[in-house]
């Protein structure tokens, strides 16, 4: 029997700043076009993104007389990009095999059948490959609205996306059945 235990931690952090705008027509053909001070109505933007992922995993392999084989694993992943209450996912798998060719009743076939193994497996995997902050509603500073408030006009912002408080792990389950065999090896 063999046993494997492990963990991993992943952290991504990104920051950016940008100034954009338009220069007047007279600066398009001059080398000073790249001078930021000539930008008309500059727009400053910046962003910060931080994501983390914590994982724990284990695997056990068991072999009895090299004929009966078992492999089982469990992975637990926690991701900051998913919604509260859905951040952790658990992904088990199991595989079994029977090397039929090593059984006593197969002895008469050993001169031409070197290997005959039946196998089956089942497992699930998870994916949290989405952008950060999709669980939160987003408001874009460019989406201004104007409305009357008392005796004046006030500006406001409207959400560009609604947050999704149900974002969870995308889970894929797979099954595998097979026969391995070898002749005159």
Functional labels for PLM-detected ranges:
Residues 1-185:
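Extracellular/periplasmic, surface-exposed regions of secreted and cell-surface proteins
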């Amino acid at each position: 029997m063999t046993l494997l235990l492990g963990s991993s931690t992943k952290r991504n952090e990104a920051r950016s700043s940008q100034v954009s705008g338009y220069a007047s027509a007279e600066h398009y053909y001059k080398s000073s076009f790249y001078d930021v001070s000539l930008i008309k109505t500059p727009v400053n933007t910046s962003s910060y993104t931080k994501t983390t992922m914590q994982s724990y995993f284990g695997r056990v392999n068991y072999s009895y007389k090299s004929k009966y084989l078992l492999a089982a694993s469990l992975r637990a992943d926690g991701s900051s990009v998913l919604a509260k209450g859905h951040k952790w996912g658990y992904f088990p798998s199991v595989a079994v095999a029977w090397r039929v060719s090593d059984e006593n009743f197969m002895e008469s076939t050993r001169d031409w059948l070197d290997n005959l193994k039946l196998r089956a497996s089942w497992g699930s995997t998870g994916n949290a490959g989405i952008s950060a902050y999709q669980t939160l509603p987003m408001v874009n500073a460019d989406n201004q609205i104007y409305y009357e408030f008392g005796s004046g006009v006030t500006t406001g912002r409207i959400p560009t996306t609604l947050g999704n408080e149900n974002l969870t792990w995308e889970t894929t389950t797979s099954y595998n059945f097979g026969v391995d065999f070898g002749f005159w090896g």
